[in-house]
């Protein structure tokens, strides 16, 4: 039997429990309040953090979208911009480097008055129908035939550049920079009777002018080019003797970085040959087609021909042997002797070439001749005697397989007198001749300089090909510079062997 709990103990116990309950309630309230405050702060932090993160994400996404949008727009513009990668900037040179040079046209070339040929933006006097021969030889009714002088290439090129579809006034957009310097006329007016200081004076001034231009620092001139109507050796005088020929333009440090386009190159890798100007400067594709049709179907009276003169004082010249064989060919060869005939008459020259199956192209004072392009224009198959006269010069224009459009006879065989031109050319089958002439006629649009403002039809002429290949060259050099490769030795200093004959047989389609 349990003992009864005393009443006092019960009262004390009850009071103690009550106090504990009161204290517990008070602490519980404090804890709850504290917890609520902490929770509120944490929530505020989390809300602020999340909001901040979301804002950063949104901002980042916004900027990314904007960047993507800009890039997409740029890509879209590049895709729609037909001039992307083709823009060319033409320096506005002081007139002392071009226009002022040709204003005094009479003394530009000693013993020859250049003034009559300056008209029509360098194309020369227009050839009009004066007799039946002119009408029969040329398609003069088109108004596209001119008495064009070969040395005016730089003037013709500059005029074409003024009409180039991707010419820009913003040099930062340009992929290449054209320097409209009349280097050929600058040197030719000082070749006789002037010392080397006078010959080099303007070139040195231009080098300094270029070096001070903001465009120069981009590639130090490796994206610059100029055009001349003279051969490369006129600008590579290695000594400073007054008796030495030419100027030292291409030996100046600045110009050693430039690319020169001229009618004939030396062995240096920063020179490229472009065609001599012909007499034909069409203004439409129809004119070209009409001319091609004419020369493709014309009946040719002579097996071969030679337009030129002997070079008795030139060591190693084969012209004497060529003339000898031509005169002894019993009517198979037509010889137009430029020592006694007017070889500046376009009608006379084109008549000879149009009447010939093959046209002989021996070297003269230098490797190349304007006659090469006049004969091709006439649909006459060229006969070369040195690789340096055509194959290793006009690499942008002629097929790599020279057998497709020409005949090659080594100079040595002509000197030895062991070759009969009449026999070699006479043994070529008619079927092959037709194939070769077809190829020659295909080349015609590539070797002529169309009139500025050519019709809407697109066909690449000599100017277009030169510009496109120049842009490709600059792009390659720029890529190599970005990769840290040596461009100087490969693209500017390296020499090539102009006498080497490289046999390449192209696959026929």
From Swiss-Prot:
The EC number on file is 2.4.1.-
| Pfam entry (one) | Exostosin_GT47
The stretches that face the Lumenal side, renumbered to this chain, are 25-509
Source domain of life? Eukaryota
Q: Which InterPro entries does this UniProt record tie to the protein?
A: Exostosin, Exostosin_GT47
**Residues passing through the membrane, by range:** 4-24
Keywords attached to this Swiss-Prot or TrEMBL record, sorted alphabetically, are: Glycoprotein, Glycosyltransferase, Golgi apparatus, Membrane, Signal-anchor, Transferase, Transmembrane, Transmembrane helix
Indicate which residues are glycosylated according to the record.
Answer: 27, 59, 65, 169-170, 195, 257, 416
Q: Where is it made, tissue-wise?
A: Expressed in pollen grains.
Q: What subcellular locations does the record give?
A: Golgi apparatus membrane
Give the primary localization class.
Golgi
Listed GO biological process terms: protein glycosylation
Q: Residues on the Cytoplasmic side?
A: 1-3
Report how it sits in the membrane. Answer: Single-pass type II membrane protein
Single annotated GO MF: glycosyltransferase activity
Q: Which GO terms describe its cellular component?
A: Golgi membrane
This chain's function reads: Functions in xyloglucan synthesis by adding side chains to the xylosylated glucan backbone. Involved in the galactosylation of hemicellulose xyloglucan.
> What's this protein's family per the entry?
Belongs to the glycosyltransferase 47 family.
Protein name as it appears in the record: Probable xyloglucan galactosyltransferase GT12
Name its species. Answer: Arabidopsis thaliana
The gene behind this protein is: GT12
């Amino acid at each position: 039997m349990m003992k009864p709990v005393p009443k006092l103990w019960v009262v004390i116990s009850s009071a103690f429990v009550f106090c504990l309950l009161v204290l517990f309630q008070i602490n519980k309230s404090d804890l709850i309040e504290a917890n609520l405050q902490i929770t509120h702060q944490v929530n505020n932090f989390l809300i602020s953090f999340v909001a901040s993160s979301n804002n950063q994400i949104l901002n980042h996404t916004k900027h990314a979208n904007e960047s993507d949008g800009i890039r997409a727009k740029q890509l879209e513009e590049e895709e729609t911009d037909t001039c992307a990668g083709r823009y060319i900037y033409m320096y506005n040179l002081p007139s002392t480097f071009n226009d002022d040079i040709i204003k005094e046209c009479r003394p530009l070339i000693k013993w020859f008055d250049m003034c009559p040929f300056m008209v029509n933006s360098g194309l020369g006097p227009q050839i009009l129908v004066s007799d039946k021969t002119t009408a029969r030889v040329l398609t003069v009714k088109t108004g596209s035939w001119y008495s064009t002088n070969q040395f005016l290439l730089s003037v013709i090129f500059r005029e074409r550049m003024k009409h180039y579809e991707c010419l820009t006034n913003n040099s930062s957009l340009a992929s290449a920079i054209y320097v409209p310097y009349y280097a050929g006329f600058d040197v030719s007016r000082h070749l006789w009777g002037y010392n080397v200081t006078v010959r080099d004076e303007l070139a040195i001034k231009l080098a300094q002018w270029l070096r001070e231009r903001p465009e120069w620092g981009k590639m130090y001139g490796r994206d610059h080019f100029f055009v001349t109507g003279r051969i490369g050796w006129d600008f590579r005088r290695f000594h400073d003797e007054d008796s030495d020929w030419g100027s030292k333009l291409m030996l100046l440090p600045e110009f050693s970085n430039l690319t020169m386009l001229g009618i004939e190159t030396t062995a240096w890798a920063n020179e490229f040959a472009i065609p001599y100007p012909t007499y034909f400067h069409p203004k439409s594709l129809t004119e070209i087609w009409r001319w091609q049709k004419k020369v493709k179907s014309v009946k040719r009276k002579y097996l071969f021909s030679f337009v030129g003169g002997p070079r008795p004082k030139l060591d190693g010249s084969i012209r004497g042997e060529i003339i000898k064989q031509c005169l002894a060919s019993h009517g198979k060869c037509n010889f137009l002797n430029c020592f006694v005939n007017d070889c500046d008459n376009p009608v006379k020259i084109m008549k000879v070439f149009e009447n010939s199956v093959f046209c002989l192209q021996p070297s003269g004072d230098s490797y190349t001749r304007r006659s090469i392009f006049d004969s091709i224009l006439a649909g006459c198959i060229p006969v070369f005697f040195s690789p340096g006269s055509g194959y290793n010069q006009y690499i942008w224009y002629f097929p790599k397989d020279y057998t497709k459009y020409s005949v090659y006879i080594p100079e040595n065989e002509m000197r030895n007198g062991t070759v009969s031109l009449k026999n070699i050319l006479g043994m070529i089958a008619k079927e092959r001749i037709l194939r070769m002439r077809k190829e020659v006629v295909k080349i015609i649009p590539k070797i002529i300089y169309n009139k500025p403002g050519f019709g809407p039809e697109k066909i690449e002429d000599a100017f277009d090909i030169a510009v496109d290949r120049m842009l490709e060259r600059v792009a390659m050099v720029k890529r190599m510079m970005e990769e840290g490769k040596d461009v100087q030795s490969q693209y500017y200093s390296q020499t090539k062997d102009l006498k080497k004959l490289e046999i390449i047989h192209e696959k026929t389609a």
